[in-house]
């Protein structure tokens, strides 16, 4: 009886999970890189709505060094799309987290390597930039013109 209940719970759990759309693989890789480089008390999600460029879209001038990391990352993705015909949000790539740095694998000039380098540069930039609480959830209409 116990085995039947356990199997039923697993099947229901798997069926429920089947309706959840997967995150694009690259975004999962990028989140892992960010978690590796930022201070322990922060979560990657705290960077998702920061300044004028960290999060969806972006406009105006970056408001600080951390926001500039996101601005550069956005432009890097834009270049990958326009110049190299890559799709950064779904591009898979190989990398290694080691000794407080990130190593991207793959041949130079390939979409995987280009996108990995964009994410690597941004994640390391996040780790070296001050996080200012007052720059989270700012009024972008007011401060990002």
Swiss-Prot record:
Gene Ontology molecular functions: calcium ion binding; calcium-dependent phospholipase A2 activity; phospholipid binding; toxin activity
This enzyme's EC code(s): 3.1.1.4
Localisation: Secreted
Pfam families in UniProt: Phospholip_A2_1
Alphabetized SMART domains for the sequence: PA2c
Cofactor(s) this protein cannot do without: Ca(2+)
Disulphide bonds in the chain: 52-144, 54-70, 76-118, 86-111, 104-116
Propeptide: 18-25
Annotated catalysed reactions: a 1,2-diacyl-sn-glycero-3-phosphocholine + H2O = a 1-acyl-sn-glycero-3-phosphocholine + a fatty acid + H(+)
Cofactor binding, per record: Binds 1 Ca(2+) ion.
Main location: secreted
Enzyme active site: 73, 119
Superkingdom of source: Eukaryota
Tagged with keyword Nucleotide-binding: no
Assigned keywords, A-Z: Calcium, Disulfide bond, Hydrolase, Lipid degradation, Lipid metabolism, Metal-binding, Neurotoxin, Presynaptic neurotoxin, Secreted, Signal, Toxin
GO BP term, pick one: lipid catabolic process
Residue positions binding Ca(2+): 53, 55, 57
Post-translational modification: This enzyme lacks one of the seven disulfide bonds found in similar PLA2 proteins.
Tissues expressing this chain: Expressed by the venom gland.
A GO CC term attached to the entry: extracellular region
Keyword Glycoprotein attributed: no
InterPro entries: PLipase_A2 (IPR001211), PLipase_A2_Asp_AS (IPR033112), PLipase_A2_dom (IPR016090), PLipase_A2_dom_sf (IPR036444)
PROSITE patterns, sorted: PA2_ASP
Subunit structure: Heterodimer; disulfide-linked. The A chains have phospholipase A2 activity and the B chains show homology with the basic protease inhibitors.
Chain's role: Snake venom phospholipase A2 (PLA2) that inhibits neuromuscular transmission by blocking acetylcholine release from the nerve termini. PLA2 catalyzes the calcium-dependent hydrolysis of the 2-acyl groups in 3-sn-phosphoglycerides.
Full protein name: Basic phospholipase A2 beta-bungarotoxin A-AL1 chain
Organism the protein comes from: Bungarus multicinctus (Many-banded krait)
Source organism phylogeny: Eukaryota, Metazoa, Chordata, Craniata, Vertebrata
